[in-house]
Amino acid sequence: MSAFGGPGGGQINQKPIPPQRGSFPLDHDGECKHVMTSYLACMKKVRGVNDNECREFAKSYLACRMDHNLMARDEFKNLGFQDVKDSSNKGDPAKKGELRW
C-alpha cells in the first residue's frame, strides 16, 4: 500500500524549533569582514585543523560581532572558548627533542 495516497498518509505537521541561540543579523556592511577573512586564511593555512592561532581569530570575530551588535553579547566560555591548559606540561618547559612522560 502506498503511503502517499492511503488513509492516514497525510503529512505530519510539526512546529519548527528555533535555533538554540536565536537568529542574528548578517554582516551586510562588512564591519567584521577583515577578521573573518583572516580566520578563513588561517583555516586554509592549517588545513582545517583546530589550531590555537585560528581559535584566536574566531574569538576576535565573535568579539567584533558582539561589538557591532550583530549578535547578542555573551561570555566566551559559553561560546566554547575556555582557557586550555595542558596538564602534562606542568613545571619547566620541554626542550626540543626531549621526551616527557
Swiss-Prot record:
**Signal peptide region:** none
InterPro entries in alphabetical order: COX19
UniProt-recorded name of the protein: Cytochrome c oxidase assembly protein COX19
Q: Where in the cell is it found?
A: Cytoplasm; Mitochondrion intermembrane space
Q: List the disulfide bonds.
A: C32-C64, C42-C54
Write out the residue ranges of the motif Cx9C motif 2: 54-64
Q: What does this protein do?
A: Required for the assembly of mitochondrial cytochrome c oxidase.
Domain CHCH intervals: 29-72
| Keyword Mitochondrion carried by entry | yes
The principal localisation class reads: cytoplasm
Q: Where is this region: Disordered?
A: 1-28, 81-101
Where along the chain is composition biased (Gly residues)? 1-11
Entry keyword set: Cytoplasm, Disulfide bond, Mitochondrion
* Motif Cx9C motif 1: chain residues: 32-42
